[in-house]
């Protein structure tokens, strides 16, 4: 079976390495994703265990779609009875335009009509449209008048780990945070017993993702929804086995004792980080506290990783105050962490 894993820009090599670790073969890297081959188990493992992927897609058909009629016919060439069970719900995501399909909403409607018309004709029933957590989410990409129709096995973006109860302004996406931790060498540092410190932790994403990594916790294990659960081709026994395996690995990983801390001057951010950590079932594993950057010291020893996402862009605020923040951060790094 052939699949496609979408991912953030600049992360494809990390995603490809993860996929190969899950058993994928013939991985091909693109700017924002990885094409790969594997069994359904490989795809399920990617949904459950990938720390960097955004979505896992199962391509069903690729065809010329110069206009709406060609799009409709191409979508109808797929046997939807093999994928959408009776009384299921359906959503369509459509990306891309062309001279004669100039709006994504129009493309999505045409795709939906083709699917619904086929199912009504063959089964006498039609799926209901449900934008939020449907049984089956169909993904259509239109590029240079060629359409690729896929099933979205993830259902919603895999960066949504289900632990973020509250966020802060412009939070870092979880899969991007995980990729940055990988680039910084955190897995090897954690394996050697090193510490993790984020002195500007916001809602705690770096520390929580670092803990999930260090303790061998599947990032998708907290999620209650995946796009394949309502799919007619879903293998329930296989998924149950993978969930049980993830539970056993989580229990084994809890024996690891590492110092993983996050500080922030904002009391609201710290409350959010603590709540997020509790939802991730990391109470007593990670530590968050309100602490000003000016009093930052190294009380974690000489082996570890300091990582931070300082304010920029949407979070820039007062530019003069920001200059002071960066100056203080540089001073504390030179003083305590060289």
Put a short name on every predicted segment.
Residues 23, 284-285, 302, 338:
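Short loop/turn motifs at secondary-structure junctions
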Residues 86-89, 193, 256-257, 303:
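Phosphate-coordination loops involved in phosphoryl transfer and adenosine-cofactor binding
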Residues 2-138, 142-147, 151-167, 315-336:
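Accessory substrate-recognition/RNA-binding modules or partner subunits associated with SAM-dependent
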Residues 81-83, 295-304:
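Short amphipathic alpha-helix with an adjacent loop that forms part of the alpha/beta core around
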Residues 310-312:
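Short glycine-/small-residue-rich Rossmann-like dinucleotide-binding loops
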